[in-house]
């Protein structure tokens, strides 16, 4: 991985994506075939923002494509229908959700959003012929013999080293502390972060402190950490609803260092829960910045905001999964009901990206991390929260 210093040179991907779709709009809407794409993930509870941004991104993009005539795959034109299932961050419900998708004949599913859910649905996906795009980081999901999962975002073990390196070189960070919810997802991210920090030569002053995910008073958890005065406090795998509570507690206890996480966050939730105390909070953002957005991305944000009354920066990343699915199917129409064909196409797949300026392309990556191409390529945007909105700290990439 590397930090990209010139955004004008890097991460400028083609804007041709769905432009041609309007030319395909010939027939009446109702005459198009239907293509169902599934979502199984969390849309309720403390982590709801993660899955909600998925669903809203998919629905906004599907409506837009349908409005412009549908999507041409092979010799057919399809209207896209998004079928959703809230797994409530429960692995058993995630399995039920994936089984529902199989019953409906759906072969391509976005989600789940967390490690437990993504791991639990693997047997169903492999048995029923489903390719799924989790937002979860266990490498065993993406390394052989596994082959049905495609990582839909930048992993914490990819973004963490980049964030720590940047803060070490640019903010003088020398000491670091970690705190995580006592669940497999954040604990795994904490362990990856600790390994990355050690590799960079940072002094780890705390890495065993945990809390229950339903905690609302974080003072007892954070008091011993704040007393150690680390330069950087990492909230490993923190859910969007808990981030402002942790930040507020740390600041009210007198913590003056930097605070970061490798998970995506919601600016509105931070503003409502922590206000100006959240200023300077560093997180992984969506895969877009005002400087690199294409007109198509601006239009997506406009449509999303009009449809739902607000926009979540995380949707800058979540917009990509549906696009990758549809463009890969367009590249090999046989894959529409045969995931083996989809897998064959991934190794050489390349398509214009409608969401950022420039001439780079959508492609599958992951060879370095997984030994096979089982990850979507998106810009790695690292944000700093400031006065109600995210500002770009730096942009990187993963191979």
Question: What residue spans do the PLM features occupy?
Answer:
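Extracytosolic ligand-binding ectodomains
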Residues: 2-3, 8, 12-15, 29-399
């Amino acid at each position: 991985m590397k930090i990209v210093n010139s955004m004008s040179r890097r991460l400028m991907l083609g804007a041709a994506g769905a432009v041609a779709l309007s030319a395909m709009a010939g027939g009446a809407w109702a005459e198009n075939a239907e293509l169902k794409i599934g979502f199984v993930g969390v849309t309720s509870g403390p982590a709801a923002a993660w899955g909600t941004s998925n669903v809203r991104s998919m629905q906004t993009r599907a409506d837009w494509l349908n409005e412009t005539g549908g999507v041409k795959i092979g010799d057919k034109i399809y209207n896209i229908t998004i079928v959703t299932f809230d797994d409530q961050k429960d692995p058993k419900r995630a399995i039920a959700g994936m089984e529902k998708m199989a019953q409906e004949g759906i072969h391509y599913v976005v989600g789940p959003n967390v490690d437990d859910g993504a791991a639990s649905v693997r047997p169903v996906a492999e048995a029923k012929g489903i390719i799924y795009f989790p937002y979860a980081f266990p490498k065993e999901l993406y390394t052989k013999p596994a082959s049905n999962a495609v990582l839909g975002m930048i992993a914490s073990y990819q973004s963490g080293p980049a964030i720590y390196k940047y803060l070490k070189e640019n903010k003088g960070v020398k000491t670091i502390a970690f705190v995580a919810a006592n669940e497999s997802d954040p604990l795994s991210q904490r362990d990856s972060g600790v390994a990355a920090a050690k590799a960079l030569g940072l002094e780890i002053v705390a890495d065993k402190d945990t809390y229950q995910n339903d905690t609302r008073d974080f003072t007892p958890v954070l008091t011993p950490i704040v007393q150690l005065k680390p330069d950087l406090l990492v909230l490993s795998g923190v859910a969007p609803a808990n981030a402002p509570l942790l930040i507020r507690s740390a600041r009210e206890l007198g913590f003056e260092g930097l605070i970061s996480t490798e998970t995506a966050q919601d600016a509105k939730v931070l503003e409502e829960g922590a206000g100006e105390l959240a200023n300077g909070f560093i997180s992984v953002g969506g895969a877009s910045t005002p400087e690199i957005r294409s007109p198509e991305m601006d239009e997506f944000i406009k449509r999303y905001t009009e449809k739902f009354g607000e926009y979540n920066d995380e949707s800058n990343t979540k917009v990509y999964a549906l696009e990758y699915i549809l463009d890969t199917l367009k590249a090999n129409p046989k894959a529409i009901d045969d995931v083996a064909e989809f897998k064959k196409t991934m190794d050489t797949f390349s398509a214009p990206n409608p969401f950022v300026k420039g001439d780079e392309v959508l492609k599958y990556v992951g060879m370095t991390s997984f030994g096979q191409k089982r990850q979507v390529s998106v810009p790695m945007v690292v944000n700093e929260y400031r006065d109600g909105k995210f500002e770009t700290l730096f942009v990187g990439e993963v191979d």
